[in-house]
Regions:
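C-terminal and inter-domain tail/linker signature
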Residues: 1-119
């Protein structure tokens, strides 16, 4: 079985989201606390992430993602802690939901709302 959170972390670290496409459900939902509208559809979500990664590359930026365990408010749920531009201050926490062995939801959240520990 594919470690879907690990795959997502790898995609962020390599700045390449193409490998993620077959692992997103057809009705995958992408939400962000910084964006008003929710995106729906695996292809739509993947296309958005690919476009975003191209913008990051074009500006010379970088992203680092690390696996964490949430302590609060969702005890023991694993997530990705993302850093953008430096590896000291996290920019967001990424939570996923899995249904039928595919990612059905990606939630981008403010890290200040969580307590976590590195895996």
């Amino acid at each position: 079985m594919v470690d879907l959170l690990g795959l997502l972390i790898e995609c962020y670290n390599k700045n390449d989201f193409s490998p993620l496409r077959p692992h997103l459900s057809d009705n995958c939902r992408y939400t962000s606390q910084w964006v008003f509208d929710e995106m729906i559809g695996g292809n739509t979500v993947c296309d958005y992430l690919i476009a975003k990664s191209k913008r990051i590359s074009a500006t010379g930026g970088f992203v680092v993602a690390k696996r964490v365990s949430i302590l609060s408010p969702y005890p023991e749920q694993e997530a990705a802690l993302m850093f953008q531009g430096n590896e000291e201050t996290p920019s967001c926490i990424i939570l996923i939901k899995i249904e039928s062995k595919k990612i059905s939801q990606i939630d981008i959240c403010m890290p200040q709302l969580f307590k976590y520990r590195y895996k």
